[in-house]
């Protein structure tokens, strides 16, 4: 589709003055080959693994939670109320607990009750930095998860921090290329991107923004209202896990699954972020090459790093400054030939 809005959208103010501008870092819980969503028996106990979603945790959350519920149903007679432990209080644990709690007695155990990886996520709905098997069955499962997740996010709306957005790109998106067309249709093809200085040809993908501070707070509040309050617990070994009194255990420990369940396929991928002050009127998303900009109600989130096998939640001020400069240059219409020399940039992945 060839399209052009004609209107010029406002560009961000990239002024970074503390304390309103904050540098952050998050570690994506990436898994080689595919995310893990399956049952692993341990004697009389069953662990349902739900981890390895990389940068797509919020995106896939409801779909994976729905899949977890279906796996639980295979373990118990129909209509039986079970005692279920959920490990992890990030988005995967919270959404799984939310769907399980109406029909089961759910307890959440986590080493972090807040301040999880999900809390520093950007929030665009797109399956980024996540793998799945190439088989037809695995592709179908992945696409079904995306369909369910998108539908459940969209149906919850603003009270869960969800709003429709157009994501503008210079080139076709690899992440959106994984999404079935009945979920996110083919992008609008634009003669010019709709910004004052960023006017190259591009595309517009109709997707969602899921704002983590609103979404996660709502999940936690709703669970607490139903009597499900996460408990602090540190698990160092599988024996610690299967020592729980619950016989069904949902493992949503993300990156921690690598050491806890001896999974060598789990790899940390650190991303640097700059949180600028919130700015009214920026009702769009942008992601291409070395930078992405996600305006939200709490911050304008600027990112673009991909540090493979780096597990460090301490922001790197130099890299954050680079990311901010690149985003500023993009929206000023400036090109930068030297960017490819930096291997940690998102554009190289």
Sequence positions of predicted segments:
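Active-site substrate-recognition segment that forms the wall
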Residues: 1-43, 52, 57-60, 66, ...
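Flavin (FAD/FMN) cofactor-binding and adjacent substrate-gating region
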Residues: 13, 25-44, 118-120, 148-226
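Short glycine-aspartate micro-motif
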Residues: 48, 84-86, 249
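Short beta-strand to alpha-helix junction loop
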Residues: 56-63, 134-148, 202-218, 314-319
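Helical element adjacent to the flavin cofactor pocket in flavoenzyme catalytic cores
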Residues: 62-72, 197-236, 242-246, 252
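Glycine-rich helix-loop-beta junction characteristic of Rossmann-like nucleotide cofactor-binding loops
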Residues: 71-79
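A catalytic-pocket lid/entrance helix-loop region that shapes and gates access to the active site
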Residues: 128-134
